[in-house]
Amino acid sequence: MEKENIRLFGLCLAFLTICNTVVLAQYIPQEPNYADTTMWITRDGDAEGTGADVFYVVSTWEEDWTTENGSVCHFADVRNPVHRRHMAIEINRAADYMAPGNRFYAPYYRHTTMETWMTLNKDTIANRCRLAMGDVCKAFDHFLQQRDPQRPLIIAGFSQGGKAVVELLKHMKDETYSQLAAAYVMGYKVTPEDTAACHNIRPAQGDSDTGVTICYNTVKDVKYIQPVIAQTCMGINPVNWRTDATPATLHDTITVTLSPEYHVLVVSGYSGSEYKPYKGFLNVGDIHSCEPWLYSEQIRENMQLRSRRLAKKRGR
């Protein structure tokens, strides 16, 4: 019996060693250096110097991938030309409507892959996002060191980038928060745990309050809410800036109504067919991929309004 126990112990030890080897074989890309200008996409659309500084965080673009030596990676590589090109597609499209009248800054970062989110496992997502959010916080700190603190500040992000906005609100000091015109969490959730952890997360109540968080997620029906992304405790309609169920008309044919119970936008008259379903996970009744684009005109105008309101409050 004693020999059998020793043999089993040896097998367990070998198994743990194998498991550890698997963990060690996972590849972590090199950390970005945010003093390097190649780690950023920036645009200066503020010739008069009267606009805001917009810090934008890109969403999830990469799937799990394998290095040449067979190691699996769950993160984007900011030095991989293909990964950079993917992130740049979204960043440049966001800059097209966020940069005019403002100064726009967006870092490349080691965002975690789609497979991470598809696990639907809170611990896995939290553990892998820790590295990604660490990159974003470091980029934000570098950005703060360079910018004029008298200018209004806007932070915005889509999907995983929306999660980053929530984490930045927790990360920023009160002095930085006092410079915040608004934070835009597009296509991601704000949870009761988030609001309990951070007094700087305050839901927007209208179109012009400042220092607030604008959060929205779009679905065809509340039954399509994806909990890992959109089970939120706050929401506002970016078409009429209401927090009740008053419907709004967008582009003449689309009706957008906030569900006060679920805090998501329910749309009718819009199929979202340009956004193909992704592996049964996204765009399957939710219209996740539309978030930064469907309401872009309203978001652009709102950023300007809240920035002007904050500048007036601060005597600029």
What is each of the regions a protein language model found here?
Residues M1-Q26:
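Bacterial Sec-dependent N-terminal signal peptides
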Residues A25-D46, T50, A76, N80-R84:
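Basic, amphipathic N-terminal segments that precede the first structured/catalytic domain
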Residues V58-R151, S273-C290, S296-R316:
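Active-site catalytic motif of lipid deacylating hydrolases and related acyltransferases
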Residues G157-G161, V165:
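Gly/Ala-rich beta-loop-alpha elbow adjacent to hydrolase catalytic centers
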Residues G51-S59:
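Short beta-strand element of the alpha/beta-hydrolase
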Residues T50-A52, P100-F104, P149-P152, S178-A182:
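Loop/turn elements at helix/coil->beta-strand transitions in domains of secreted/extracellular proteins
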Residues A132-P149, K170-R309, K313-G315:
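Surface cap/lid and interfacial helix-loop subdomains adjacent to catalytic sites
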